[in-house]
Design a protein with these regions (language model features):
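Extracellular/periplasmic solute-recognition and catalytic clefts
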Residues: 132-134, 190-201, 226-290, 297-301, ...
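Ligand/substrate-recognition segments at binding pockets and active sites
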Residues: 11, 194, 247, 356-381, ...
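Ligand-site clamp/hinge motif
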Residues: 92, 175, 208-258, 300, ...
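Gly/Pro-rich hinge or "lid" segments in bacterial periplasmic/extracellular proteins
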Residues: 55-68, 113, 157-222, 229-233, ...
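Surface-exposed binding/hinge segments that line
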Residues: 90, 124-168, 184-193, 338-353
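Detector for C-terminal structural segments
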Residues: 31-33, 47, 54, 193-198, ...
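N-terminal lobe/hinge region of extracytoplasmic solute-binding protein
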Residues: 1-82, 110-113, 182
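Aromatic-rich, solvent-exposed beta-strand/loop patch
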Residues: 72-76, 98, 103, 144-163, ...
Length: 570
């Protein structure tokens, strides 16, 4: 994005792989929930989240050791215009799908147009910025853009290339499990049972084994995703060896329950892994499309009523630090105190529309650690009163006597979230609010969140050191009401849109950082999400035969790292 890539044109392999890793073995992970689709490229159905990374080979691949650098995979070469107004890719000779047929420019152009018109919403925004797509040679294609946006040349390199002939006569947007996608990537779906498991096998004839970006990766023969009804069942399966790799998010369980026989005798290894990526945002999001949460003062009251310090002690022994903003734990996070310098310049035109704290400084409410949280409760009552709500006969009501109530929607398998909400409900009772808690199965949960049919729900948004066009999907106004989008809170803010636009057109690293810091301020002071704790390290328990390189990239345990750079060795 800025400057030069870290690796030279003749690099041999990525710095965080073992180019001499052996091949073989299997990795089995536990997934909570279910699935009813194998097509990760459309909105319909519930798909194992990993499939879009396994099945979507693209022109370029992202290095996990650099925020904004891509290297060739399907692309033999890439060229851009002087102002990145166009980008041209040349397809590698010999690139092939898993059925042995060659990848062609016809496949490329069909994939881009199909994904951009009837694919998942994550693909639609890019396509609207493509002015033209033209074949410029037997193995080359050029994309010309209709807006100034430095990231578009990178995004163009990261779209999955699918086999056009497989989808002839098929409604691409409506497919679920009846078609198993043919891919040019290293793995292909070998077997599956809806709602139970998906097995992916390493393609022994994979065309790209000698491509530098792929060398030393995709070493494990079978990647198997096993599905369970809840976290307890998944953990029990790991304990008895049905699963051989487990990513643990519950620090209390990590410290108290990872002492079973397989760990004691050395058959299972515990790995604690650092990373340098932002915290992202995890917590409970409020839907501003609903009347209950359209007033920022009500959202602020909900934040004050959430007794984080008490909950964190109960859930993690206070060992997990709180998320303080969307890009906290990174150089892109908002600074303490008033907005200054370039950040203030960017926000000043929108000062009248920004919420308190955006310009002058803001930090999340902090409790005293006690269960009653008296100061937080008092502030919550004060903000509710400012918004027109008071306690009448022990219940929070408006001037017309209507009670303030809302629904909290949770996913069936998320026992940790249910425990947090149980404590939150007790805190809300102290301000006369009694929410309804609804636990839905995975399919219902996805359908309702896709349609924005919720008041408050669990929210997790991983963010990187290279934010770009995806921020429009997360927080932009234009598609805020498009079903299946990612703007769950329903943000429609000219300041947010402008900051995203600025980070996309920044021509220097300093300007880019200022734009992200400004965006972080607007989002955090918008009080859309009640943040919980962050995972500033990764905790993985795995069979001793599963190994990874000593050098951990900047992004750490992130899509593209496990199982990609791991190997199995007895």
């Amino acid at each position: 994005m800025y400057g030069d890539p870290a690796l030279p044109p003749d690099f041999v392999s990525l710095p965080y792989v073992n180019p001499d890793a052996p091949t073989g073995g299997r990795i089995v992970t536990a997934e909570v929930g279910s699935f009813d689709s194998l097509n990760p490229f459309v909105r319909k159905g519930s798909t194992p989240w990993q499939l879009r990374f396994f099945l979507g080979e693209s022109f370029m691949g992202r290095s996990l050791d650099e925020p904004f650098s891509l290297y060739g995979v399907l692309a033999e070469s890439v060229e851009t215009g002087p102002d990145r107004e166009w980008v041209e890719f040349t397809l590698r000779e010999g690139a092939a799908f898993s059925d042995g047929s060659p990848v062609t420019i016809e496949d490329v152009m069909w994939s881009y147009e199909t994904l951009g018109t009837v694919g998942h919403p994550r693909y639609l925004g890019f396509w609207t910025k493509v002015d033209s797509m033209e074949q410029t040679g037997e193995r080359s294609v050029r994309f010309t853009f209709n807006v100034e946006d430095r990231e578009l040349a990178l995004l163009a390199g990261m779209r999955p290339i699918l086999k056009k002939a497989q989808w002839d006569g098929v409604d691409f947007a409506e497919t679920t499990t009846e078609i198993v996608p043919i891919t040019s990537a290293p793995y292909m779906i070998d077997d599956f049972e809806p709602g139970r498991f998906v097995s992916l096998r390493r393609n022994p004839d994979y065309w790209g084994n000698d491509v530098p970006f792929r060398r030393g990766t995709n070493n494990i023969d079978e990647v198997r995703l096993e599905f369970f009804g809840d976290e307890t069942a998944a953990f029990e399966a790991f304990k008895v060896g049905e699963v051989n790799s487990n990513r643990e998010f519950n620090v209390a369980r990590w410290e108290s329950q990872y002492n079973f026989p397989a760990i004691q005798n050395g058959d299972v290894v515990l790995s604690v892994l650092p990373h340098q990526r932002p915290s992202g945002m995890t917590g409970f999001v409020m839907n501003t499309r609903r009347d209950q949460f359209s007033d920022w003062r009500v959202r602020d009251a909900m934040l004050h009523a959430f007794n984080f310090e008490f909950i964190n002690e109960a859930m993690t022994g206070s060992q997990q630090p709180r998320i303080t903003s969307y890009w906290s734990n990174s150089p892109l996070g908002m600074s303490d105190g008033p907005a200054e310098g370039r950040v203030r310049e960017l926000l000043s035109p929108f000062a009248e529309s920004l919420l308190p704290g955006a310009m002058d400084g803001y930090s999340l409410p902090m409790g005293d650690g006690t269960e009653r949280n008296r100061a937080g409760t008092a502030m919550a009552l004060e903000q509710m009163e400012a918004a027109g709500w008071t306690i009448q006969d022990g219940q929070m009501k408006n001037a017309s006597g209507d009670p303030f109530t809302f629904e909290i929607l949770l996913d069936q398998g998320a026992s940790e979230n249910q425990a947090i909400i149980d404590m939150y409900v007790e805190s809300l009772a102290r301000i006369g609010v009694t929410p309804t808690v609804t636990v839905a199965d995975s399919a219902q949960f996805k359908e309702r969140t896709d349609q924005y049919d919720f008041d408050m729900t669990y929210y997790r948004r991983g963010l990187s050191l290279s934010p770009g066009n995806e921020q429009y999907n997360y927080y932009g106004s234009e598609d805020a009401d498009t079903p299946g989008g990612r703007n769950l809170m329903g943000i429609k803010s000219s300041a947010v849109d402008a900051m995203i636009g600025r980070l996309l057109t920044s021509e220097s690293q300093d300007d880019f950082v200022a734009a992200v810091k400004a965006l972080d301020r607007v989002l955090t002071t918008g009080r859309y999400v009640i943040p919980i704790y962050q995972w500033n390290i990764s905790r993985l328990a795995h069979a001793k035969e599963l190994k990874y390189p000593e050098y951990i990239p900047v992004f750490g345990d992130w899509p593209g790292w496990q199982p990609d750079v791991w190997w199995y060795e007895e």
